[in-house]
């Protein structure tokens, strides 16, 4: 009985990984593969994402950094992206773009921004805490009018979000 559950979990996890959007994993897999090697993490929204190039720091100063910033990140998303990253890495320095500090909302209207920030991380206590915090407002909706509260499980189990993506799969999936 336990083996059947483990097998089912493994199959669901494998299918989820196959059909998920790849943006989050493409951005974060190099970080996850070498998380212990980074001295500096950069976090924030599009300003940080497009304005900081860790490879230049490496080439000029020998400082290893990784840019976790992403388009549409609010300060709460950035905070939880950092907390999730700290489950994997212990950088000496974190550089935080706080341009969005005056925004009064936790989530932007684009739910794909949240997926980009969190899909790459395995289910963990930190990821669950992040989603509980970010998706606690029943009035917060995405651009399609869907309440984030109703989408929380899609961020933990991406198969719920991407199950219909079969027709879009390519050889690179």
Predicted regions and their residues:
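Basic side chains
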Residues: 27, 90-92, 152
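Secreted/periplasmic serine-hydrolase-like ester/acetyl group-modifying domain
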Residues: 111-173
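Short, small-residue-biased leader/transition segments that mark boundaries at the very start
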Residues: 2-3
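Membrane-embedded segments
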Residues: 43, 47-134
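Alpha-helical transmembrane signal-anchor/signal-peptide segments
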Residues: 15-37
